[in-house]
Each structure stands twice: as structure tokens, then as C-alpha cells.
Amino acid sequence: MRTVLLSKHDELYLEKCAQENQFSYGIIVGHQADLTKSVVVHLARNNEEDADLEDLSEVRLTISDINSQALASQWLSASKMCPGSFDVIGIFVSSVRSDVVNEQSAEFKNAKKLFSDIYDLLLKSNSSFGVYTTDIAQTDFVFLSYSLADKKVLCKNYSYGNGGTFTNMEFRFVDKPFEWIQLECSYDFDDVLPILDSSRRVNIEDQFQSMIVSVRKNLLASEVFLQNEVVEDTIDLQAYIKKKKTKVDKLQPTSTTGGTATASSNTTDSLPRLASEGIIGGTETIRASIVLPMKCQLSKPTDIKVREFSGTLHMSGIITSKVFCNPRNSIADVKRFLRDDVLRSLITRIQVYCDGLTDPYVTNEALYISEPPRRVFFSLPSEGPSASVGAVVQFSEYLFRGEAPTVVVAQAKQILDVDLDPETISVEAEGLPDDTHFNNCKMDADCIDDSGIMTSSMPKPELSRSLYMVGIAVALLVLLSSVALHFVLAER
């Protein structure tokens, strides 16, 4: 049976939502620790509720009054902020009444319809840019309801198949803080794709879609290295860290003189070294590398074709990736989280960029340079004792050139229901693109255009005008010389 783990802070948040608004709802951000266990990372109340209804204490809001469009919008926006190891795993409802935790009530039946509506909206929204993951799409979700009247919690597993069904699942509020291990890598883009659209005006969004498909294909065929070495997929992250620790311990010499150096002291001395190398996890970072295969290995020789194309799409840049894993995650899951984070970040940048386009069509004769937003990171503020140990969990947002961190503050409040300090936002993880690179591209394009004109059989307009003026000047000079010669001969 599937189990959901929550912290005491989550219980206090549910109680707070019911006390302040009498009826609140929102999303659940979680992490898949293993096949049967999920960890709740964050609960975020939906802030797009009707303000007029909130002011009316006589109005009794129910699950049927929930705006599925607003909740789906929050779901999608939060998914863009989550690292690759986290997902929106469900929704929660917090109320002062007890019928929200009664399986026989009408509220429980309305919850099933709400999930069905939201899932349909999510599928429709994702159809244009594909899924956010390199794995299969998620179909099981969590429904969590809290009643302030009797301090009771109801937790169910919702499966979209077979018309949508609720099944039992366990939940526990744990006192022990959750432990997180941070992994970080940089993914370098430098690839050229052909534009096969033969029309004069090309849809740039369609070309971005082709780019996403290509990157996803490369990520699926890639290999992930941890600390510059290949690690077996079958072991878990905790065993990998222990193995690295044991390996370093064996390198420490054991002194037999003086009676002060022992195996225990060697283990203690090795911990700072492990921490400095980013091996033991905790507050340190494990460095990862995504290695792509050779292009010739991605396709068979029979798949190679010679085709005409109308232009090229050049991808250039670096994506900074940060994921946060549970010690019991398998290495296979860790690698998948890193790949998902890169793909999710790329899709999010493209979506944010395309949302700001006034005209998605460009001519295939022009040099079109796109600068998607860069990624910035922020930590969730905690009230009271921290609900986690080890690495501090971070979410991300995207800023265009010239935008201030205050944009992130507003987005975090609206989507994740957290109050951020602009000074705590990490904006240096990804730098701004170098303008000289764009200028060089433009100069190269100009040179290509000039060379095309030089090969023409027609003379340049500037050269024709010069020859015309020289001809007139020579004619005037000959005319003046003739007149002068005529006067000289006439005087004689």
C-alpha cells in the first residue's frame, strides 16, 4: 500500500489554512522516495480564490465550488518551479467542517470529479510541448483533506484509469526531519538542427518543439556520472555514499606508534575530506555529469538521409541543474531526476519565452536570435524548527534580462504561498549570454549575404554611379580642351 509521509509543519499549515479561511485548497509538492513511499515537501494554498466570497463569512464553500481552472494553473506553474526530483503529487482541502473527511459525504464524491477535471486540463495544457519527464507520465495522485472540527485527516490515492477511482493509502506525520542530499550538474547546449519547413514564414514555436524532441532523445540515450565515475543503477544513494566513505577510509594510514592513531580516528579524520570533496552529501553537493553519446550511435546507418532544408536552428547555452534526493533513492532514480530537471528547465524556458511572443512567425531569410530567461534559485523559508536536515531544498524561477528579483517574490507568493526576501534569491547560478556571440553571428550572416551579392553578374549600384560620374567628368574635360584649342587656333 502506498504511504505518504508528512512533517509536523504540514499539520500546522493545514490547521492554519482552516482557521484563516474556513475553507482552503491547494497543491501538494512531493518526492517519490521509493515505489511505495512519497514524502510531502511543501503544501501551497491556492491564492486565486474569489476575494468577495472570502469576505462573506456566511458563505459555506465546498469542494464543488473549487475553480478547477485556477487549481490546474497553479499546478502547472508549480511544476515549472520544482526541481526534477519533485513533482506536484496531488491536492489538499482544509475546512472547519467534518464532512470533508467523511467518505460517505457528497464532498468526497465531488473530489473525484475535481481530480478528473484537473487531469483533463493538464493533458490539454501539456499537449503542445510534451511531458515534463523522460519517464512515463504520472497517473496516480494524492487527495488529502483536513477537518479542523475533529482534527482528522483523510488521505486517498486517486487513479485516473477506469474512470477515476479512490483507493486507500497510509499517511503519517513524522517528528524526525527529512534528510536531503543535493546533486548538481551543468548541461551544455551546442547543437544545430535543420528547419525542414519549406514555407517562407516559419513558426518558431514548432521549431522549439523539434528542439525539445531532440534534447529528450539525447537525454534518454545519455549516461550520468557521479563524481566523475560510473555508478551502478541498482544501489541506493545511501549505499553509494557509504561506499565512497569506506574507500577514503582505506586510503588513510593507520599508525601503530604512540597509541593515538586508531581506525576510529581515521574514520573521523576522513569525514572533512569527504565533505570537501562533496562525497558524503549532507550540506555538501555531489557533482554529476551528463555525458551524451556520439550522434552516429543514436541512429542506424540506414536512417541517414540527404534532405533539403530551409534554415538551421542553433542551440547554444548552459542549463544549471540542482536536484534534491532522499538517501534511499536508487542511483537509477537519481539519474532520472537529473535528466528530468534538464528537460523540465528547457521546456519551461521555452514556454515562458513563447508566452511573450506577439507573432510566432518569422521569415526563413532572417537571422532570428532568441534569448530565453535564465534560471534563478530560492529556498523555502521555514517557520520554527526546520522540517529537513542536510541540504536546503531549493525551487527555481526564470527571469528575463533586466527583470528584478522582485518578480520571483511575487510569483512565489502567488503559486507557492511563501514570502521571500529578494536578497536571498540566488541570481548568479546562470549568467547572462555574451552579446559578442550574437554580434559575431550577425557579422557572419552579413558576410554570407555580401558574398552572395559579389557573385552576381550585375555591377553594384555604387560602382555604376562612380563610373557614370567619371564618364561625365572626362567628357567635360574633353569639351573644355576642345574649346580652348579652338580659341588658340582662331587667334593665329
From Swiss-Prot:
Provide an example Pfam family for this protein: ODR4-like
Spell out where the chain crosses the membrane. Answer: 469-489
* Keywords, alphabetical: Membrane, Transmembrane, Transmembrane helix
Q: Does the keyword Transmembrane apply?
A: yes
> Biological process GO annotation list?
protein localization
Q: Which GO terms describe its cellular component?
A: endomembrane system; membrane
**Recorded topology in the membrane:** Single-pass membrane protein
Question: Subcellular location, in the record's words?
Answer: Membrane
Instruction: Give the highest taxon in the source lineage.
Output: Eukaryota
Residue ranges with Low complexity bias:
254-268
Q: Where is this region: Disordered?
A: 251-270
Q: Please describe what this protein does.
A: May play a role in the trafficking of a subset of G-protein coupled receptors.
Question: Which PANTHER family does the annotation name?
Answer: PROTEIN ODR-4 HOMOLOG
Q: Which family does it belong to?
A: Belongs to the ODR-4 family.
Q: What is this protein called?
A: Protein odr-4 homolog
Q: Which organism is it from?
A: Drosophila melanogaster
